[in-house]
Amino acid sequence: IPYREFLLETVPYFVEQVEAYENGDDYDKSKVGLIQTPQSFYNADIFQFNLFSESTLPNEQDFFSKEINVCNNSHGAAVYTGSNTLIFRKAIEDVGGFPTDTITEDFELGVRMNAAGYVNYSTKSPMASGLTPTDLKSVIKQRARWGRGVIRSSYNMNIFFNPKLTK
């Protein structure tokens, strides 16, 4: 569920390139493809809940969402994690739309955008919240899906040898 400030915080990243595109100017594709805000949750994750430490331990997704993904900004390749995101529609169109042959279409779409010359940014401030799995079976199912999906997307994109993904 997005916070009231979501669009106020994310839309400004796109203003210049949208104006250029609408005016028929040749907009620079090395502009923003998406803005990823951190994952944030209303409920305690499985570790916080079982350790009775909701107020003392951060959510286990916080380190990636608020630290690692923000560091990815230094090379314009923040990971698209599927929610809490604003995406430049033209970027989606330029890469052929959302991938349909993977279960982690979010991750692959972000990589495709980078390969097409777009930059993806992540912010430190959460702008939306959702629910995190609360039992071990659900966590294992989610993480197995993430792992399988990233492996499939890596194969689809030839991610380790794709010259468009290295600088």
Predicted features and spans:
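Catalytic donor-sugar/metal-binding loop of nucleotide-sugar-dependent glycosyltransferases
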Residues: D101, G110-A128
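Long helical/loop segments within the catalytic core of UDP-sugar-dependent glycosyltransferases
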Residues: R4-I103, L136-T166
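Active-site donor/metal-binding and catalytic loop motifs
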Residues: K124-S138
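Short Asp/Glu-rich motifs
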Residues: I46, V111, T132-P133
